[in-house]
Amino acid sequence: MKIADTTTRSKAFVDHDLILCRYFTDFYLPYIKSYKKTYKHDRYTYFKHIDPFFGKLELNAIKAMHVDQWIAEQSDQGYKNSTIIKHLVLLKRMMRVAVRWELITNDKAVNNHRKIQIGDFRQKFLVPEQIRSLIKECYKSQHPFLGYVVELLILTGARCGEIRLAKWCNIDMDECALTVPVSKTGKRRTIYLSERSKKVIALIRKRSESLGIPVTNDAYLVQNPRTGKPYNDFQVSFSRALAAVGINDVRVHDLRHTYASLLIQNGVSLYEVQKLLGHSSPNMTQRYAHLNPNSLKQIVNNLPAFL
């Protein structure tokens, strides 16, 4: 269904009898399919966590009371507050779009819910000694590309999916850049490559050729030799490498946090880290501010040099 159709059809029934499930299926889902690569995740989240409670409610009938009850129900089911917030974000986004399409007059109900308490953002960083031992162990893995991928993630701060789905045509060695056509934020972004990153990519090319994997513009940077497709993830092999070097409670995504922490601790500004990580909002990067607590003191101490 086209969005134009959505706007035209809305006036016929929306204000009174459009239930959330129909809105999601007939209107919202086709809309996000047109631009959002992760629409399947939203579809799963909706039907798993939102539809059972709200699906049969009319859009205009959803009240803050319902949202509070739903939050309590999610909590009773054992979901962490951080997870509930993620579910709530989708519901809010759906209602915000409904307002923009004039399907409902406002989205106050989903914004007047009780405050959800959440602890500190989970931050797990590896120190240089751990990084060196982990990379060394990953290169010993039976997984043909684990070592290259892990090292590249630490060197670039890329999201795992950005490396996993990268193609050779996205890499410009002369410009020292890997282009992500559509990032998590829905925008094109550039990942800058250091000389070491370029060497790792060259090693990936050599490894691929030795395995008989095509290295053409349209081929994936890291391709499963058995399926000819990109790997779904690297978590199993990564977890084995972690266990072998005695590192606990670390995810692949924590390599991105490690990259950010190394930058901050070496004097890179939050603004620069934001750009390198591809964060759409400085609020996302602000979580790393505590990593360089002496920066303000250093600035004050340096002031006399300017006088």
What are these regions (language model features)?
Residues 1-61, 65, 212-215:
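N-terminal DNA-binding module of tyrosine recombinases/phage integrases
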Residues 62, 146-147, 248-266:
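Short basic/aromatic active-site micro-motif
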Residues 85, 100-160, 164-165, 174, ...:
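Basic, Lys/Arg- and aromatic-enriched nucleic-acid-binding interface segment
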Residues 100, 151, 155-162, 237-242, ...:
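C-terminal catalytic core of tyrosine-transesterase DNA break-rejoin enzymes
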